[in-house]
């Protein structure tokens, strides 16, 4: 799996380092591939427990994320980047209590890190080439959403059940990420 991931990253770096303008279809394809890789890694981590049902919580995904078709493509890239960044930050925290395979967590973090670095480069390019303005309300709501997740983990002292709940929530995030990347390909 690691070899496949490295080959995929190398090919994508070749595609994007020579590009001077954003190809949204190609970017959408690449993001979908990366998101699927992350989902696969997250599924491999799963050790759900019915005993954790009492710990479930509604973290309240921002409405604007649920309705991604309202974004401009540049805004969608900004939101996707923020989501990858926050997911990376969450899984960079102490996962030792989970019993998860450390290699799988490291592969997840590597994929997320590469993706967010790549998106930041593309966002810089967009900002340079286009007269792009953005309403910060969506990003603020998104940051508050992820802050609720982090506070939940801290309040539950990073317990196995807390991580189980957060794991399920992050998997749900990839549903929204898929919709955003599909939007880029249209």
Curated annotation (Swiss-Prot):
CDD domains: IFab (cd00095). It holds the Pfam family Interferon. It comes from the Eukaryota. Its main location: secreted. GO terms for cellular component: extracellular space. The lineage of its organism: Eukaryota, Metazoa, Chordata, Craniata, Vertebrata. The keyword Metal-binding does not apply. One of its GO terms (biological process) is natural killer cell activation involved in immune response. One of its GO terms (molecular function) is cytokine activity. It comes from Felis catus (Cat). Gene3D superfamilies: 1.20.1250.10. Residues 1-21 form the signal peptide. Belongs to the alpha/beta interferon family. This is Interferon beta. Keywords: Antiviral defense, Cytokine, Disulfide bond, Glycoprotein, Phosphoprotein, Secreted, Signal.
């Amino acid at each position: 799996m690691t070899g496949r991931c490295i080959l995929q990253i190398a090919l994508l770096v070749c595609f994007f380092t020579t590009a001077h303008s954003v190809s949204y279809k190609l970017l959408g394809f690449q993001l979908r591939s990366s998101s699927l890789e992350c989902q696969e890694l997250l599924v491999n981590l799963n050790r759900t427990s019915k005993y954790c049902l009492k710990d479930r919580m509604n973290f309240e995904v921002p409405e604007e994320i649920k309705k991604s078709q309202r974004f401009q493509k540049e805004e969608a890239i900004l939101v996707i980047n923020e989501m990858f960044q926050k997911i990376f930050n969450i899984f960079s925290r102490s996962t030792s209590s989970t019993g998860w395979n450390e290699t799988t967590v490291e592969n997840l973090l590597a994929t997320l890190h590469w993706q967010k670095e790549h998106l930041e480069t593309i966002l810089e390019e967009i900002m340079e080439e286009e007269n792009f303005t953005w309403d910060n309300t969506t990003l603020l709501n998104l940051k508050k959403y992820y802050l609720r997740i982090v506070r939940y983990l801290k309040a539950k002292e990073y317990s196995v059940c807390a991580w189980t709940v957060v794991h399920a929530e992050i998997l749900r995030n990839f549903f929204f990420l898929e919709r955003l990347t599909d939007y880029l390909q249209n």
